Amino acid sequence: GSIPACGESCFKGKCYTPGCTCSKYPLCAKN
């Protein structure tokens, strides 16, 4: 798997950094 590299946590299932998703819950990861 890839390493989360978005520097934020999921918030209510969403990530606010462009190109990032909550696929590595509870962390955001590059989509």
From Swiss-Prot:
A Pfam family: Cyclotide
InterPro entries linked: Cyclotide (IPR005535), Cyclotide_sf (IPR036146)
Species name: Viola inconspicua
UniProt KW keywords: Disulfide bond, Plant defense
Cross-link (Cyclopeptide (Gly-Asn)) at residue(s): G1-N31
Free-text note on domains in this protein's UniProt record: The presence of a 'disulfide through disulfide knot' structurally defines this protein as a knottin.
Post-translational modification: This is a cyclic peptide.
Name the UniProt record assigns to this protein: Cyclotide vinc-B
Function (record text): Probably participates in a plant defense mechanism.
Keyword Zinc-finger: no
Keyword Iron among record annotations: no
Similarity section: Belongs to the cyclotide family.
Disulfide bonds: C6-C20, C10-C22, C15-C28
GO biological process: defense response
